[in-house]
Amino acid sequence: MEGAVAGVVQDIRFARSADGVQIAYAVHGSGPPLLLDSCWLSHLQHDWQSPVWRHYLVELGRVATVIRFDERGHGLSDRGVTDHSLEARVADLEAVVDDAGLERFAVLAMAQGGPVALEYAARHPERVTRLACYGSYAGAQVEATAEELELDAAFTALIKVGWDRPTPEFRRVFTYLMIPGGTEEQMRWIDDLQRTAVDADTAVVAREQRKLADSSARLPELDLPVLVLHSLGDQMNDFAQSRHLATHIRGARLVALESDNHIVLADEPAWPVLLHELVAFLEPDREALAVSIAAAQAAGSPDLATVLSPRELDVLRLAASGCDNDAIGAELVLSVRTVERHLQNAYAKLGLHGRSARAGAVARLLART
C-alpha cells in the first residue's frame, strides 16, 4: 500500500506481533533510520494527508528514513484487540523493528508512546542509538493530582457517550486540548481522526490499560543520548511529566517549547525550534551513515564486516549462493519485505544503485572470500 504527500511516497507494510496481532507500519524518507513510537491516535493513511502532522512527516523524511506504526487496535493495525498492556505494546514495537530489518536506529517517542519507547530502550540498549521524547512521559500517573484524576474519569465518560456519534461536539473537547491554537480546518481534522483511528469501545479499553503503563523504574538504567521536548502550555500531558523524565535520565536535555499546543503546528514560532533541535539531535547518526557510505565508495573492496550489519551480511551471503529473496527469507525466517530492506540498506552502504546493485554487492562479497 502506498500514499503520497508533497511528492514523497510512503510504503505501508504489516508486522505480526508475538500474539498474532498485525501491526501496520509505514516507511518513507531517506537517511539513518528513525522510529516514531506510536501516539494515542494515529492512522497511517489519514495522517499522511494531515494539516496537523504533514510538516512533521515531510521534514523528518528529509533527514531520516522514518518508520512509524499504528498502535494495536488503531488505524490500519488489527482492530478489536483487548490487550493494550505495556508488554503487548513493547512486543508490537519489537515486531516492527524486526520486520523492517532495523539493526541500530534512533527513536522519537511521542505522547503516550513514551513508556513503550523507554522500556524498549532499556531492554535493547544495543539497538537504540538515541532517544527523543516529545510531549511524553514515563508513567501516566506521575504526580497526578486529585483534580487531574477526576478530569481523566470525565474524559473516559465522554468517550463512551460521544466518540462514535456522527457530530463532533464530544470529540471537540479532546481536540481543544490537543491543539487549542489550531485553525477550524485543523480542528475538524482531529475531530475526524478520532473516529477514523479507533472506535469508542477500544478507545476506552486502551485508555484504561494505558494508565497502568509505567517505565519510571527504567529511567536510571538508560545510558544513551536523550532529548526531551515539551510544550509549556500542553494540556494533554503536563510539562511536569517531561521535567520528570529529564531529571531522572542521566544526561538528558530538556527543551521547553513556547506553545500551548500538544502538537506544535507549522505556523507557530515553536515549530522551527522543535525541528532544529530534532535535526541537530539526529545529526550524529547522519554523520555516521555518511562516513560508512563514503568509506565503502572510496575503497575498491572494503572489509564488508565493517560496513554492513551481521544480518545484512547473512542476507548477502545467501544472495551470493544463488538464493532468491523468497529462499533467503525462508532460510533466515524473515519476510520478503525484510529481506528486500536488508539488501537495499547494503546497496546504499556500498554506494550501489540501479539494476546492477545486487550483482555488484555479490561481487564485492565474493572478492573477499
Residue ranges and their predicted role:
Residues 134-192, 200-207:
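Helix-rich cap/lid subdomain of alpha/beta-hydrolase
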